[in-house]
């Protein structure tokens, strides 16, 4: 729908317009209107006629302009502007609009008036000459609107004239229509115009508001015209004079309360050429002027009255009507005596008015009397009121100053009036000291200075004046007189004021720093005149009273006073204060001889120590140099690191003797150290000074290596900034010495090699993990010394800092512009090589300690180094070295010749066969090609000569290619290759002896440190374990033939798993996470049960554990259990996890071995034991291994995971309900401690804050980071809580903790609920939030899914409502249904489910018992929802079947065991629950309470 159609539709729906249409169609007129009709619109129709010649849409819009609601009128004007813009023929519309302009341009709504002006502009611009016929109606209203009280409307009206007419016609238009405007304005003011009465439909303002607005606007029409065209134009006077001839109007104006209207009328009267006559003919105006000379309002009444008085005073006609002596003069005195806001106006009009008054009053003698009285009136009614405006007060002071200046410059009256002026000036000065404003003080002091410089008054009178003012200053006090004192003593003042200045300085109660400073900055004549008159110098002798900003002026004054030979009484004691230190820095023979010579050396030392604390080296150097010249030696050790101090000393070293060279070199090295150790960058002059003193033999003493050797985390930006500082320094050095300085400052190639040698133990990571052909040097055949995690990360971090620093410096490379290529010097290539090696080392470190994330510094360092590395020929040439580093070989792809040369070099004394080299380093061969070449080449594989490196190389590369080929080995076309590779795994790892080969397991069994002694063996073993894991994953996840899968599971898996267990037995507690340890951990996590084929000879030594000896463990079991829990207490997390993985396999054995009787499946349910049944026990090693401290931070959660394993329903653990309850009781105490460790003691990023905070933070992090990707918060929750991710990564323990928390609330909901109840209040809300937001909804979802997927038979139908968390169970018997509703709360299990039972089909008390039993099961006994429903169903089943209740507990199903009464009395045949007869789990213990074993009913003996 177009805009035009929408307007038509809107107009059609308008109520008044529709009504008008209905009237027109029915032939009705306006007679008989109902109250619902718009009478204002009907009345306006007469004015609008029939709108002939315009379309319906325009007609409707025009009618909106007469609506009562101003918003409708505004809308109509906007629609009208759209019509004007869109329609070409608008003449008829223009004619009708012209009739509405008078009402619209004076409308009560400013918006309507504004839019009216804009609409007129559009009409004039579009119609141009065609608009002439309506100008007589429009332009007068436009000119009237130019004076609108709303600025926006006035501006829009001005735009009508500006845009609607050509430039040369604008003035003519205004002049042409001005008389009409004046006539209309005059009538509106007098209330004789139609527009002065509100229009019926205008409800925007009331009558009085409209009247006031239009009166103001009308008078503004006259005043604005006069302002624009000047008073010479008289066309306005005819209509304006009518206003002053209208007595009623004038009485209304001056008798009313509209002050603005009065001011406008007065201003208009002043503009007449015969203004005095107009004013005098209107008595109310004269009276108004006299009465408002002291008006206190903030309106312009007062200024307008004084303007009229200035007009009237010279007029003789005014003198005949008003007496100057008896009328005006007394009125002036009253106005001057009055202290109020009228002085803001009086300042500008009083002096001209007084001058006119004196001129008209006649004789000089009379004038002197009048003038004296006027001046005395200034000081009447003092002091000023406290609430007086400060602007008014300042105006009073300015007016007085103007009068004094006028009087003293008038030779006729100045000396005559001086006697009266003198005390008045003193009084005014005293009054100025009561106002703490600088403007008032400046007014008075400028007047005094002017009087002194005028020289009209003799010196004696001036001195008397100043003495009187000084006495007033003393009387006012220090604070009140502060501004006056400062201004009177300012530099540049007349020397006459020196007496006052000296007296102020000599008075301790009046002097302050500004007065002292004014003296120190004064000119010589003034200074000498003042200083000679000072009688007391105590103001400067107490130097401790001055701060550091004042010390400079004080020292300058002291120096001036010391140089003045006539001053003898100065007594200053130099101390370690701001003035004393400034005196020392100022120096000079005069200060030294008169003040500093006898100062103790300790005082000077204290000054130097102070500057050292403030890091002001320049001051120290200046002071030390001056004192040294004076023969005083000072201790400057503390300032040795201050750059300014060192630079200043270097610059002061004038001598170049050999004896000073050593001292100079020490200073240069100290300056070098200070610049680069400073947190802030040095200034350019610092670098310039250092570069001037650096020579080619400068030795930094490995400064930067020491600088970066810090164990604390270092800011990468600081390293880069340090490199930039080096570049700045090198750029400033002389060209012939620059390269030598670079060589001495940056790291040399030899030094780089020395650093890399520290990381030989990490070369094992490259051999085991790199997919590239690995170089093996002779060093790999020797024992590695593995560093612990802390030390390893520390030295890698230091090396990364050094590498980044060296490679970031731009001075390490230069360009050959002609070839447009980089060329590196030996140093630069060494730094590049070092950088490549360091990033490889960082990656190796990251792999080794994979459970802990690299520090932010190491990650950032690696990125920054990588960005600056360049693959160049110079770096590749380093590979030609006879012993290239394995890190560099891994980072770069060696050429065939390089590889061949290197292998041959390492294979001495025998050469490597050419075909072997071809196999190893053939270009572009796939993993399968390599495997086939090795398989068909007849090389020594698995059982090889270990003295030859190339045999190791072939074996290592073979297994790496097998890993790359992966599960495809199973489907290789050459079946022999598959068998060859699979048998190779067993061959390398198996315990059997083949010829002279001793396999990995044998070697470890005989020599546990064998891998450390020969790293190649560890690399090979690691890779074959990794190959097994890759193939095992392929069997699980890929589609392979059934025969292949069965062969794998029946032969390879059991054999290799037993080898893993034997390898675990050889793991040492202190062993570092080498590739073998990490890979073995992965392998241990793949085992689902403890292998049964582990030979007993795996037990080499037996560690006696007293707690285990009481149970029937085999020697092998006891040995492995002891080993697993020993590893749990390791400080190495990977070793801890190996112990945990083994313990997890051993828990089923431990649980069954330590609870043999309770877990006996053959026990007769009906058999009753007199003695209490044995409780289930937590495996003793779990409770024994619980840490008593927080050294091993992960042990608690790991043990908790082991402890709750029996509660999981698996092949190893199938506990009935009674056993579950018994085991929950057994682990209750342990669970509380372990859960507390899980929640509170995990030191991730928060100290003394629950681990759940970390979990919550992690969830929010993922939700924020991946909100726009496929990673959602929900998927992260499932990953953390539901998936058992055993991948060794920095997130391992976070995910482990999350999963363990979820398992805990799933298996032990009641225990978790109790834990939440008892944790400290400050942790409780956090724990509640995390469980509710993340874990609860997943737990509820799991519980509902279990119930949904369960089968309950035909009689019980169960459905779930996921939205509300409800489970509805309906038990049906014939046509009757009993419904049980369980509703899980949002924070389940922290809150218990709500349960409701409807339509019980048994007795109410029995149904209630069932519900109470279900509630107790879920609330206290860690019961699952599904098991609770099954228990309730069994109760109902038995109740329906008529099973008898146990007569002890009166229940059919036992509350805890969920068993029916099965123990039968042989005499009475009644059945009882066995736990009711003998149990520690229940309140009913009949045999205990009765102290006999008889039947509760027939008393027959059970035994």
UniProtKB/Swiss-Prot annotation:
Pfam families in alphabetical order: LTN1_E3_ligase_5th, UBC_like
Q: Describe, by residue range, where the zinc fingers (RING-type) fall in the chain.
A: 1446-1499
Q: In which pathway does it act?
A: Protein modification; protein ubiquitination
Q: Where in the cell is it found?
A: Cytoplasm, Cytosol
Q: What class of enzyme is it?
A: transferase
InterPro entries the record matches: ARM-like, LTN1/Rkr1, LTN1_HEAT_5th, LTN1_UBC, RING-CH-C4HC3_LTN1, Znf_RING, Znf_RING/FYVE/PHD
UniProt repeat feature HEAT, residue ranges? 52-89, 93-129, 133-170, 280-318, 323-345, 346-384, 552-589, 640-663, 664-700, 845-882, 1022-1065, 1078-1117, 1141-1183, 1302-1340
Q: Name one GO molecular function term.
A: ribosomal large subunit binding
User: Which protein family is named in the record?
Assistant: Belongs to the LTN1 family.
How it assembles, according to the record, is: Component of the ribosome quality control complex (RQC), composed of at least the E3 ubiquitin ligase ltn1 and nemf. The complex probably also contains tcf25 as well as vcp/p97 and its ubiquitin-binding cofactors. RQC forms a stable complex with 60S ribosomal subunits.
Known function = E3 ubiquitin-protein ligase. Component of the ribosome quality control complex (RQC), a ribosome-associated complex that mediates ubiquitination and extraction of incompletely synthesized nascent chains for proteasomal degradation. Ubiquitination leads to vcp/p97 recruitment for extraction and degradation of the incomplete translation product.
Annotated protein name in UniProt? E3 ubiquitin-protein ligase listerin
Species, as recorded: Caenorhabditis briggsae
